[in-house]
Structure formats: structure tokens, C-alpha cells
């Protein structure tokens, strides 16, 4: 079965085509980063308007790239939520219109489910069950993933998400938008051990996270020091070390509690090389396998939505009816409510 996936939850427009027999056939992505840079963050109204301009051309691009026609598509999967309401409405309306015109099923996909399943796009892929560390600009969660649609929350941030803390600290360091990747690049030039920042909730008796205090500590340190390039790099390294230390320790604790032997890391911060290195180092010789998405699938993308749609379609005893054209979005949506 061929599933077309459409992702428009925030500031990336993603389209992909997934075949349940031949895997991912093709995908295309348009990032709005340049448009939002002047504002220092995502402007929801601009994001939704740009999705309107981009979705259908990307659909055409993917169909041409894979030598496929819309008439051969068996279902359309789209991000129903969570995300920016206007952005979600764009993807939902276009997806349902296409499905209605073709009288094929439409599959409502949870954005975070797409991220959790994204490592399944790679080979080797994890088997169910596994622990998932979902870490991005909007979310920091540890999940027990038992199967498709079977997700149990183990722990989450009580304030800022890790990716949000990265971006805000990068801004304090004078880095451009989006700053998370730029902070990580700057940290590679840092001198280890010069500065020490707190590791909030590192030794708490739960699997929750907190990054607002770390962000404040970094801000105080930045204001206290002279703003030369080396000092900025040293602070960036200290901040990155603090965040990744907490993520690693909590992830290992989740593995011990669940007694599972597989860890999946997903979301934009999952691309961070220091996080990847630390997890691999700590898990060497433990028998625990760690899986990361390919770098292009760490950020929001259509491939993960097409995959999630295909896996959900395969779970059904019979093919669902074609879309009736009606739809809803869920700007806020708990993954455990699936």
C-alpha cells in the first residue's frame, strides 16, 4: 500500500511517500527558518501562510521524484496535532481535500508518534518494546513504547524543553536563530572543565526533567563573563554537557526501571553529536542497543508521518472508508490519549 504523508505542525513543510512493501520511496522538505530568522522565532501566521504555498508543490515534487501518480495512492496521512493551530489546519485541509477527491482513507497522525517511530525508517531498526527519549524544542519526554499506539509516559520536563533551553541560551550567547545547532557547533571549540553548570533533577527519584534553572544559571554566567569568543565557546560546552548529562542519566534509569534492552532517541535534539556520543559510551558492553534516526529525520519531516500512517493502516483488519472531507485538528494532544 502506498501512503502519502504530509507534515505541517510548525515551521517545516514535509511530504513523503511510503510503500508498505518497499519502504520509503521519496520525500521532500521545505524549512521556513530563513523567513522566521528576522523575528528570532516562529511567527504562527507566517508559518501557516507559507505552508499553503508549499504543500501542493511538494506533493507534486515527491510524486514526480518517485514516478507515481496521485491515482495510485492508497491513503493519505497527515499531522493532526499537536502544533500550531493555523499550520495544522493547512495540512489537514489539503490532506482531506485530496483524500476526498480520490475517495481514499485519511489517517490522523500524532506528531510525536511520528518522531517516536522515525528510527524505523533506518536499518537496523528497533523492535517493540523499547524506551524512547523524545527530545526537541517543544518536548522532553521518556516513553515506554510497547507497540503502535501503545505509549506510556515515564517522565517529562516540568518546565522548559531541552531544545527550548538550547535555543534560548544560544540567543543569550549572541548566536543566530535557530540557535541550538549553532550552540552545539560553538561548543566544539570549548575548553572542558572551565565552567560548571548545574544538572537540575539529576538525582531526583523520578524520571522528570527541568531545564529552566539551568537556563537561568547560564544567563547569569554569560552576564558575569567578558564576551570573547573563547569564553562563549566554554560556556556553550558547559551548557551542552549539563543538558546531555541529565538526558543520559535519566534515559539509563528508564531502561533499568523497565528492564528493556533498546533505547530510541528522537526529535531535533536527537541530532546532537555529544548526546549521541555519551549514550553510546555509557551503553557499551551493557547489551542495550541505542537507535537514532538519520539526521535528516530528526527534525520535523513528512517521512515519519507517512511511516506512522502506513503502520497504522497495516494494523487495521480492513481498509477504512474514503474521507468524507470533514476533519479536526488538535493543537494540544497527549500522546497517551491515542
From Swiss-Prot:
Q: Give me the segments passing through the membrane.
A: none
Query: Which keywords has UniProt assigned to this entry?
Result: Acyltransferase, Cytoplasm, Iron, Metal-binding, Transferase, tRNA processing
Q: How is the cofactor bound?
A: Binds 1 Fe(2+) ion per subunit.
Give the matching Gene3D superfamilies: 3.30.420.40
The cross-references to SUPFAM superfamilies, in alphabetical order and at most eight, read: Actin-like ATPase domain
In which domain of life is the source organism classified?
Answer: Bacteria
| Compartments (UniProt record) | Cytoplasm
EC number, as in UniProt: 2.3.1.234
| Sites where the protein binds Fe cation | 111, 115, 300
Q: What GO biological process terms are annotated to this protein in UniProt?
A: tRNA threonylcarbamoyladenosine modification
Name the reaction it catalyses.
L-threonylcarbamoyladenylate + adenosine(37) in tRNA = N(6)-L-threonylcarbamoyladenosine(37) in tRNA + AMP + H(+)
**InterPro entries associated with the record:** ATPase_NBD (IPR043129), Gcp-like_dom (IPR000905), KAE1/TsaD (IPR017861), TsaD (IPR022450)
* Molecular function as annotated in GO: iron ion binding; N(6)-L-threonylcarbamoyladenine synthase activity
Decide whether keyword Glycoprotein is in the record.
no
- Main location per UniProt? cytoplasm
User: What's a Pfam family in this record?
Assistant: TsaD
Q: Which residues bind substrate?
A: 134-138, 167, 180, 272
Instruction: Report the cofactors.
Output: Fe(2+)
GO terms under cellular component = cytoplasm
Similarity annotation:
Belongs to the KAE1 / TsaD family.
State what this protein does.
Required for the formation of a threonylcarbamoyl group on adenosine at position 37 (t(6)A37) in tRNAs that read codons beginning with adenine. Is involved in the transfer of the threonylcarbamoyl moiety of threonylcarbamoyl-AMP (TC-AMP) to the N6 group of A37, together with TsaE and TsaB. TsaD likely plays a direct catalytic role in this reaction.
Q: What protein name does the entry list?
A: tRNA N6-adenosine threonylcarbamoyltransferase
